[in-house]
């Protein structure tokens, strides 16, 4: 499994453990490029999660889509093996925060 695949495996396990609805859009010729690896919904809030390994960063197109999603009110996270705790932070913010 690739390093990014391991990050995705951990994200998937976290989403399932918290019973959060999600899907993983597939980048096909009929899909849209730049969309995060995961689209989730928690208490009516849209969450995009981009998985990266190590110090890898989103592409310019991914960053543009992330900005568009944030402008529409979504949460967008870029998660790697070092910041998986951000998932818990977003859960707390959506459940208890001022959103």
How should each PLM-predicted stretch be described?
Residues 1-99:
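Catalytic phosphate/metal-binding cores of nucleic-acid and nucleotide-processing enzymes, i.e., regions
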């Amino acid at each position: 499994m690739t390093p990014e695949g391991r990050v995705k495996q951990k994200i998937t396990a976290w989403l399932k453990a918290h019973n959060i609805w999600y899907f993983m859009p597939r980048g096909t010729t009929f899909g849209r490029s730049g969309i995060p690896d995961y689209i989730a919904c928690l208490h009516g809030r849209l969450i995009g999660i981009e998985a990266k390994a190590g110090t890898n960063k989103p592409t310019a197109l991914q960053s543009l889509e992330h900005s568009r999603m944030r402008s529409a009110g979504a949460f967008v996270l870029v998660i790697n093996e070092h910041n998986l705790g951000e998932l818990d932070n977003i859960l707390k913010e959506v459940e208890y925060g001022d959103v």
